[in-house]
Each structure stands twice: as C-alpha cells, then as structure tokens.
Amino acid sequence: MQGKHLRSLLKVIPKNNVRYFLNGLYVNFDYREIAATDGHILVLLENLEELNIDGTGEAIIPRNVIEAASSVCDPNANVYITNTELSIGDLTIKYKPIKGKYPDFRVVFPKKETTYEDSRFCWFQSEFVKIVEKIAKDYVIDFEFFPPENEKTSPLKLTGVSSDCSAFVTILLCKMDVDINGKEK
C-alpha cells in the first residue's frame, strides 16, 4: 500500500462525526484489513499481503494523522502502520489511537451479485459515485456489483482486486437518507 492509496481513503473518513470513532481509519492487525466509513459509504481493504503492519488487535488512526502524513509524503512511498505509529516513506508520525469500538460493518453487506450492466448507480448521490470512481482509479480496480436487496434501505456493494496494491477492496454505498446500518434518518 502506498501513500496515494491512504490519501484516497480520506474521502470517506469524516472530520467531526458525532460518532467519534468514525473520525479515523480502522486497522485490524490480526485480520490484516483496513476500513473507513462516514456512515454512508464504506471502503474495506482486505488481504493486504504487501501492507507492512506490525501490531496486534485493532486501532483507529485519527484522520488528522493521515492528513498530515499523506499531505507531505511521496505518493508512491510505502505505508507502515503500528499500533502507535504511521509511516509513509521516511516520514513517521506517532499517534494516539481513537478510543472506542468500530462498528461491525460486515452485517450490512448484501449477498447477491449482479453485472455492471444490470447495476443501478442512479439513485446514489453524485458525490458518492465520484468517490467510488476516484478510489477505483487510485487502486486500479474493476468492480463487481452486488445490488441492494431493498432499494430504499439496503446498500450497494462493490468488490474488486486492486492491480496496483493487490488488496481486495469492498465499497458499500448507502442512500443519503439511510446510514450504514440501514436505519432511516
């Protein structure tokens, strides 16, 4: 994983969400996965074999740490994450993880798969579609689509393997009037 990949995740990490634990990047060292969500769009990176992480359990890295590191680093520099440090290339920033429990985002994943031609992006906010397109470009991904089970409350699931960093990438998109847990606002 490179600095440019980390920077693209800032698009889905909120700055001041009342659910303070969402204001950072979730890292599960044991499962070697990274997730970020603002409650309407979720990005999950799995099978990060080439990700250089050294820690145990889970950590939530504050957004401002990721912003600071990715704004001054070489976008092609490798990322290294521990329970208390984030490094991109030669730059290392110590951080204090956000206390709290990251939500169990897997409970909202739809199960059925559909082709791109049969998918319906039209009922999503255009800024969400732009975020997906940007992440797909940054990670070099062709997505497979899993349609919402219920267009009113279920998320759309997109999955693909990055040919740029060999991560398995999952993105969930929810309509604006529904949060990531499927609850209407």
Locate predicted features.
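DNA polymerase processivity clamps
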Residues: 1-185
